[in-house]
């Protein structure tokens, strides 16, 4: 069984192909046999396609920024040239798409139909940089592969069972009818990490209280009780919550009113500043990359130190919020680029909860841990580092759908 995964961004297209040969593959993640990325940000009117397969890496210039053309070219590398891994595109059994926003319409992976496409299009105002790209990917597959089954896996789906007190904003109730509510994001990653934690702890997911910390360029936490997300830090959009690489996270909304009234800021300017010029980048004045922040701190840069201190303060504060929603904690989980690789972030985050009996093993924490428990034997709470595999999780959802 061959499953193709597409993960479209506003200016990129990431894809991979899994070849499932073993009956027990669902419990044992495997590496894709083919990976491809398209970057449309390097030059106007063109893109760069990078393909990895058969032990080689190939770069191809796309002389067009037409996304349909780019995806068709990308799919061609599956069946021709040095990156050929299958005989025919018809060898692909199913295609899985990561879709950022499914609103309240979908609580699980869903076969893509005209109605589903219409819903994704209707939700474009809530995810203007992502949902249009998802539709382009879906339609490109339709053009090249015809009626092959396509499944949408929504970032918002895992959070769809949040209780009303966690999902409704304290604003005029009528706004709820306009779709203004907390949706949550990174759901595929949070769900995968919760299930992996259940395996690592050898305990049923239905008996666990977990906090998953997805810390990358975008950051969010989820409070997971008995396998269900009951609270999360991102809300109506991925801008709410934690301080992130270039996003502000939660701020006083009156700041925006003030800037518009006193300084004539437009909503386009505010949107750009809050999403692209804030967070670690905005405070440090250096970069959204923590590695660059650490380097600047070592050189005595006070703004870089402030950016890190703010990031950690807000992280600890939001972990505390998730802890209160859960009313207890079995495991604190770190994942994604920062969560998996920044030992100092894990250390400082855990220090804030030593009063609970949570104890970090500093040696384990420093040794690039992956999919292991880094707490001390006498810690009252387990601390896990889990390598998130969103593409793999989407492939699992596709397989479950095929086996229905």
Curated annotation (Swiss-Prot):
GO molecular function: acetate kinase activity; ATP binding; magnesium ion binding
Pathway: Metabolic intermediate biosynthesis; acetyl-CoA biosynthesis; acetyl-CoA from acetate: step 1/2
Keyword Cytoplasm carried by entry: yes
Nucleotide-binding recorded as keyword: yes
Record-annotated site: Transition state stabilizer: 186, 247
Any GO BP annotation: acetate metabolic process
Keywords associated with the record: ATP-binding, Cytoplasm, Kinase, Magnesium, Metal-binding, Nucleotide-binding, Transferase
Pfam families: Acetate_kinase
Cellular component aspect of the GO annotation: cytoplasm
Complex and partners: Homodimer.
Catalytic residues, chain numbering: 155 (proton donor/acceptor)
Membrane-spanning parts: none
Binding site for substrate: 98
Protein name: Acetate kinase
Residues the record lists as binding Mg(2+): 7, 390
Job of this protein: Catalyzes the formation of acetyl phosphate from acetate and ATP. Can also catalyze the reverse reaction.
Cofactor(s) the protein needs: Mg(2+); Mn(2+)
Reaction(s) this enzyme catalyzes, per UniProt: acetate + ATP = acetyl phosphate + ADP
Residue positions binding ATP: 14, 214-218, 289-291, 337-341
């Amino acid at each position: 069984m061959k499953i193709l995964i597409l993960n479209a961004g506003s200016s990129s297209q990431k894809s991979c192909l899994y070849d499932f040969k073993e009956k027990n593959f669902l419990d044992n993640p495997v590496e894709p046999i083919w990976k491809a990325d398209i970057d449309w940000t390097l030059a106007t009117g063109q893109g760069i396609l990078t393909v990895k397969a058969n032990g080689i890496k190939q770069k191809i210039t796309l002389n067009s920024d037409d996304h349909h053309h780019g995806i068709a070219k990308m799919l061609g590398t599956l069946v021709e040239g040095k990156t050929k891994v299958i005989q025919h595109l018809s060898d692909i059994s199913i295609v899985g798409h990561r879709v950022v926003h499914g609103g309240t319409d979908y609580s699980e992976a869903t076969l893509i139909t005209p109605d589903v496409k219409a819903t994704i299009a209707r939700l474009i105002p809530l995810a203007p940089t992502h949902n249009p790209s998802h539709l382009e990917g879906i339609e490109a597959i339709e053009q090249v592969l015809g009626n092959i089954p396509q499944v949408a896996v929504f970032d918002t789906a895992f959070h769809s069972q949040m209780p009303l007190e966690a999902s409704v904003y304290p604003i005029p109730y009528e706004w709820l009818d306009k779709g203004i509510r907390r949706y949550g994001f990174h759901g595929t990653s949070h769900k995968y990490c919760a299930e992996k934690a259940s395996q690592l702890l050898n305990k049923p997911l239905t008996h666990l209280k977990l906090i998953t910390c997805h810390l990358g360029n975008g950051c969010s936490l989820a409070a997971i009780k008995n396998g269900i997300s009951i609270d999360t830090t991102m809300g109506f959009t991925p801008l709410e919550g934690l301080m992130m690489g270039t996003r502000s996270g939660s701020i006083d909304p009156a700041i925006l009113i003030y800037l518009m009234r006193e300084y004539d800021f437009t909503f386009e300017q505010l949107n750009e500043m809050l999403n692209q010029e804030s967070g670690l980048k905005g405070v440090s004045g250096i970069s959204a990359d923590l590695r660059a922040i650490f380097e600047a701190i070592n050189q005595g840069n006070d703004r870089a130190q402030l950016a890190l201190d703010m990031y950690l303060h807000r992280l600890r504060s939001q972990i505390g919020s998730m802890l209160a929603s859960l009313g207890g904690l079995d495991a604190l989980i770190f994942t994604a680029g920062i969560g998996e690789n920044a030992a100092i972030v894990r250390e400082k985050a855990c220090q804030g909860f030593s009063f609970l009996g949570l104890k970090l093993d500093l040696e384990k924490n420093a040794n690039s841990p992956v999919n292991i428990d880094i707490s001390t034997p006498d810690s009252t709470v387990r601390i896990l580092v889990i390598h998130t595999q969103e593409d793999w999780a989407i492939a699992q959802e596709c397989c479950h759908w095929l086996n229905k």
